[in-house]
Design a protein with these regions (language model features):
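Short alpha-helix boundary/capping elements
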Residues: 48, 110, 114, 167-172, ...
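ATP-hydrolysis module of ASCE/P-loop NTPase motor domains
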Residues: 26, 97-100, 120-210, 233
Length: 262
């Protein structure tokens, strides 16, 4: 996609001086500190548009990540509205059928990558994997607790699910969890965790934590795949970066290694 004409005022309209600086500083890392409702999302929207319009960056080279589907939809709508204003100013856009920026949550971006690449890896999944939500996880854990003969009152599915999720967010698998366990309860959790993960793999299913950790594992074990995405994503923008957990942080770090345009 290629854009012509001088920069329209719309790209900076309504921004304060600090926001304008963030929009115009496109190379290297930029961190915006601001409270809720202070215009961070608006700044990211204008920065994304500035990259495409003024810097003539192919939208396919831009990755925009949010933490919720609601925020992702809001960002997409804001970008669409901003471009509508630009078009109304007779700002010409060439090749409008070109790919749009990659926009979505960490999880949706990981799903997209894994659907494309997981068959090329040693991960024990195929590209048509299913995704378990919290209810699916709890039902599976409930069955495992029953099959292993544990007291369902002591091993509440919600609690067990949270403990497994916490372990995965630190890249602690069931065998490592077992080594770290120092009492009956945690040794039992490690056994539930082991069975949980085996049944997930046997069902070709991932939970939300798997989506993140498996993408990190994929990139680390296949540098050639990582290289392709590093070359693609020349600019990475993340809403609410301070809320990233370890797998999300590692994903961003891996993807931004070449350009550091984040």
């Amino acid at each position: 996609m290629c854009y012509t004409s001088s920069m329209p005022d719309t790209l900076l309209e309504g921004l304060n001086e600090e926001q304008k600086k963030a929009v115009l500083q496109t190379e290297g890392p930029v961190l915006i500190f601001a409270g809720a409702g202070s215009g961070k999302t608006k700044t990211l929207t204008h920065r994304l548009a500035y990259l495409m319009v003024e810097k003539k960056v192919n939208p396919y080279k831009i990755l925009s990540v949010t933490f919720t589907n609601k925020a992702s939809k809001e960002m997409s709508q804001r970008v669409s509205n901003l471009f509508a204003e630009i078009k109304n100013l007779k700002f010409k856009i060439k090749n409008s059928g070109a790919p749009l920026p990659w926009m979505g949550t960490f999880h949706s971006i990981c799903v997209k990558i894994l659907r494309r690449e997981v068959d090329k890896s040693e991960l024990k999944y195929s590209s048509n994997f299913t995704i378990y939500d919290s209810d699916d996880q709890k039902q599976l854990i409930k069955r495992i607790v029953k099959d292993l003969g544990y007291d369902p009152k002591k091993f509440n599915p919600g609690l067990v699910s949270a403990l497994i999720s916490s372990a995965k967010s630190e890249f602690v698998d069931s065998s490592k969890y077992k080594k770290l366990a120092n009492d009956y309860f945690n040794r039992s959790i490690s056994e539930i965790y082991k069975n949980y993960q085996k049944r997930m793999i046997d069902s070709n299913a991932m939970d939300f934590d798997d989506l993140l950790t498996n993408t990190v594992i994929l990139f680390k074990s296949h540098p050639e795949i990582l290289n392709n995405y590093q070359n693609q994503f020349q600019y990475i923008m993340i809403d609410e970066y301070q809320d990233t957990n370890e797998p999300q942080y590692q994903l961003v770090k891996l993807l931004s290694q070449k350009t550091n345009n984040i």
